[in-house]
Design a protein with these regions (language model features):
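Conserved P-loop NTPase nucleotide-binding/switch module
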Residues: 25, 30-35, 62-159
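P-loop NTPase switch/communication element
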Residues: 9-60, 106-110
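C-terminal regions of RecA-like/P-loop NTPase motor modules
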Residues: 161-170
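Conserved lysine of the Walker
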Residues: 4
Length: 170
């Protein structure tokens, strides 16, 4: 891949060791050196159709565990709505990854995924919530030479609007 999880692990390593971190993942990939990490992992239903633990359910439960930081390994479905709502209820300094072609596309992708959440929220409300929830987007990609690098860092300044803080051609 482009190195999203590797970068997420590197950024998380800079978090104060005294902070309580709750990680939510589909498959355990995050490796944090902190003492206060609670790892939650999704699982499919059994052959009998019971026991499923979704990312959405895990995000909701993580908030009850009083995290200083919530880290969602990858947002790829309707859990985007739960993550955005969590970020807008005082859970700041959270981290996650999402597949997108650039910072503006991150906002659009989160909109689409949040709409899948089925809360019946109008698009304008979702856009406003996303803009309020996100501070900075770091975009990584694999260059033409095959090397992974941070290609853009952007500040979210409004719904569907980012301000480039750094851009490097790949």
């Amino acid at each position: 891949g482009a190195g999203k999880t590797t970068l997420l692990n590197a950024i998380a390593a800079t978090i104060d060791p005294s902070e309580r971190i709750i990680t939510v993942e589909d498959a355990a990939e995050l490796q944090f050196p902190h003492a206060h990490v609670v790892r939650l992992e999704a699982r499919p239903a059994s052959a009998e159709g019971v026991g499923e633990l979704t990312i959405r359910a895990l995000i909701r439960n993580a908030l009850r565990m009083r995290p200083d930081r919530l880290v969602v390994g990858e947002v790829r479905g309707d859990e985007a709505l739960d993550l955005v709502q969590a970020l807008n209820t005082g859970h700041r300094g959270c981290l996650s990854t999402v597949h997108a072609n650039g910072p503006v596309d991150v906002l659009r992708r989160l909109e689409t995924l949040a709409l899948l959440g089925g809360a019946g929220l109008p698009l304008d409300a979702i856009r406003t919530q996303i803009a309020a929830a996100l501070d900075v987007i770091v975009h990584v990609e694999r260059g033409l030479d095959g090397k992974r690098r941070v290609s853009q860092i952007a500040e979210v300044v409004g719904p569907c609007e980012v301000k480039a803080l750094m851009a490097v051609p790949c």
